[in-house]
Amino acid sequence: MWKQDETLEQIVLECKKYTEEGTVASYIPALAKADVSTLGIAIYRGGDEQVIAGDADEKFTLQSISKVIALALALLDVGEEAVFSKVGMEPTGDPFNSISKLETSVPSKPLNPMINAGALAVTNMIIGETTEQSLGRLLSFIHELTKNPTITYNLEVAQSEFDTAFLNRSLSYFLKQHGVIQADVEQLLDLYTKQCAIEMCCSDLARIGYVFANEGRDPDTGQRIVPLHVARIIKTFMVTCGMYNASGEFAIRVGIPAKSGVSGAILALVPNKYGIAVYSPALDEKGNSLAGIKLLETLSCREEWSIF
């Protein structure tokens, strides 16, 4: 794709000015410490073919990007029918933490797995008798996807999110009242906040993107580690719901499957080609990485990545 890393480095430098226009997620105290000037990217093509630029070695927590991985694991654990009996498939124009549609929809279930209510319901379906067992299975799945067995969660971020998870608590109790979840709410929130606090760098995340981009195949062996139908479900939700209530605009301007998190990370993929990870913690008003989106838009236009 690029003959030299310097080409990608130059594009990153051109987009770095946009970091000044965003703000970090201050409502989660541990995330408020992030350096707003950070911008890094990794593009993984399989095997040893990887290009990185900028601050690609900086670690970040997955936050809402973890919803993609948890959904894949839940689909493997309980199957498509069970998952979508509790969670819908439709996009929403509401913010990711909104409760309004839950109150008016019949039956009262979350519209999709990418909003917080839907993600809580999905995490509830990951098999495990305890939080530790479910989290261990999720981490093992991530280790298989990344080939990095050292990945774990950031305890400080997890505790910070657990202590301030007032809205997610209310969402969870609402879901429990309507039979969408069965778990103890505090145990579910413990699992969910640790899931969101799983920490890695751009290279790890880009490798995960490669697996989903290439129909669930391991980049080293070519063996399918995620079933084809699961990889397709994941890619579809990334297109329709992956960028919160800016998913439509992102589809038009960038045109590739992507999932963002309030840490400032974005997982993106070019189907049948690349896995891409971008990190820049300065967010726009909808909770997406401002410079990260600008970087992906620039690259997509330059390389004609759009699937539309």
UniProtKB/Swiss-Prot annotation:
Belongs to the glutaminase family. GO terms for biological process: glutamate biosynthetic process; glutamine catabolic process. One of its GO terms (molecular function) is glutaminase activity. Signal peptide: none annotated. Substrate binds at S64, N116, E161, N168, Y192, Y244, V262. Pfam families: Glutaminase. This is Glutaminase 1. The gene is glsA1. Keywords: Hydrolase. It catalyses: L-glutamine + H2O = L-glutamate + NH4(+). Its EC number is 3.5.1.2. The keyword Metal-binding does not apply. It is an enzyme of class 3 (hydrolase). It comes from the Bacteria. Homotetramer.
